[in-house]
């Protein structure tokens, strides 16, 4: 053990500890700006400086090793003045337009200026402005960069992408896209982890609120919104709502208060993804297709493969993500059921919806996947009535609320735009949702809870856990077991794929056939897994990868909390919701069975492939 004293308080810590650990362990405090626990301790900002008796210069607490007998002072006049000077210098190079910054009120630099009582900056203002393509889903404002290098560290150590790099040195130190490339050329996966770890507004997601507001105000548009599983765990954080108020029902009511005509649950899309992806897995296990099969619902992961390992794209499931499956079904199936005609040629022929069909309530008498409703029988079910009730002829504007930045890219991929109309028109992150609620002055706490709209309102528990790492794998195995055996497994039979470990592996028996699975979150972990597969060190049948550590619960579009990682807590909320669901299997969802009965026939049918599958090799970056 190493013994030291911090502001008069003795402390003993293991060898190898840093001064900052001693400070916090002793109940004292030092501010930080560039530091990220376990990721970055480069001491670039010099905000965490402390005074050590016998040492002439001040030292950064974050990366100075703790030595036996150290006497540390965190708040001497010299220390405080040095911090004030260092933060003032940062402010002199910062475009201090706080009122119009997305991080206003949630900015480390802003907090430091207030904490240190900096009322004026006595240095010449020298913010730097670098041009940026603001149509790209990720925006960098160089005038707000404080050169903390967090983005460089996270992109390298956590994601292994190395998009950001140091430019110049010493007093001319700057950060930018590596090798002088544009962001489009540098291989950015749009995971957004640099955004959630940036201490200021230098990095943000493209804001699409104005496009949504324009649609909401258009009388010729029907606005529908779909809500991803992980959003329900975090949306209240943007408004400082306690979890008991930030319920699913109040979330649905909030979207209605914002003016949306329909509020749907992306859990329906997740259940459909499981049916298609699980069926595809069984096909591949039977020798049809490249093995192992990789999940395909994370666009950050798809971008990573396209950029780093284009030779591995055949391993991806062809199933679209829940967002995109939902979008396709909304505009081609549900839109017709509700009396809206999508502006696409052949839409009536594409969706064989029965005339006078209900809104998907009730369970089909034919089990999904039995072949009882093949393409021919569905086509014979009758064409949609042109006189169906509803806002006939109005255009559907489909908004998705996601915990993800890469979803903005995915929605705009040419493969997801049929005719001239995208399946998903706009994507809002959870942070944008919070800003939209404030903009529209919605008093969320005063709203009564309401359900999501039919026919996409009742997702299974399997769909809910999509938002946690391992959730897609667990949900797929639940239904794959049923498709093989005709009976349900214990819904908790596959919980061993849960957890925040970066790379997990397990084998399960699916009716006499052993299935070897792996789960990875964080792209640096995914790279290690790919290398092991390539080297023949491991063999798997099914691999789930989520670009963000912890999965969508830790997504790049989630609320930002300085020095706190909440993916684990949010994941636990999703597991609790799963346990409370009346239906915990995707194949038992009433809306899923009705959709196959009325529209698709069975998983992997021709119609299902046309609507719910894609070829990622054709995606443009």
Task: Tell me what each language-model feature is.
Residues 1-4:
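Short structural boundary motif marking the start of a folded domain
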Residues 6-9, 53-54:
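Short strand-turn-strand beta-turns centered on an Asx-Gly dipeptide
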Residues 15-69, 75, 79, 206-621:
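Iron-sulfur-associated redox domains of electron-transfer enzymes in respiratory
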Residues 46-190, 203-222:
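Fe-S ferredoxin-like electron-transfer domains
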Residues 162, 195, 433-434:
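Mobile "lid/hinge" segments at catalytic clefts and subdomain interfaces of large enzymes
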Residues 182-206, 306-310, 427:
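Helix-enriched interaction subdomains in cytosolic or periplasmic regions
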